[in-house]
Amino acid sequence: MNFSGKYQVQTQENYEAFMKAVGMPDDIIQKGKDIKGVSEIVQNGKHFKFIITAGSKVIQNEFTLGEECEMEFMTGEKIKAVVQQEGDNKLVTTFKGIKSVTEFNGDTVTSTMTKGDVVFKRVSKRI
């Protein structure tokens, strides 16, 4: 399955609780909670580029499945992680006590991030 495309956020659950759990300042949480960000994914074999635009903030991360890479987290912090593919439609990684699962189903992408007992879920649709 090729994951390339542009996707816009439709819904999110537990945004504020998750952002607090990962140390995001309250003023940034308030600014970001209603933004319907756009993610552009470019896949070339096992190599991926994610460009995430939320308001004026743009985060660009590149990785190759199964290889350690450095990525920018939503807090602006640089992290090291290894992204794996599970089955035909899931990208999974764990970093700093956070498990991230991105699942592709047709024109819908569901991203779930879990830290402790706080689960943040974001659903995006292809545009």
UniProtKB/Swiss-Prot annotation:
Sequence positions bearing Phosphoserine: S39, S56, S100
Positions carrying N-acetylmethionine are M1
- Modified positions (N6-succinyllysine) are K31, K36, K46, K57, K78, K90, K121
Source domain of life is: Eukaryota
Q: Where is the signal peptide?
A: none
Q: Which GO terms describe its cellular component?
A: cytosol; nucleoplasm; nucleus
- Family to which the UniProt record says this protein belongs: Belongs to the calycin superfamily. Fatty-acid binding protein (FABP) family.
Subunit structure and binding partners: Monomer.
Cite the domain annotation text. Forms a beta-barrel structure that accommodates hydrophobic ligands in its interior.
Give the protein's recorded name. Answer: Fatty acid-binding protein, liver
Q: Which organism does this record belong to?
A: Bos taurus (Bovine)
Q: Which gene encodes it?
A: FABP1
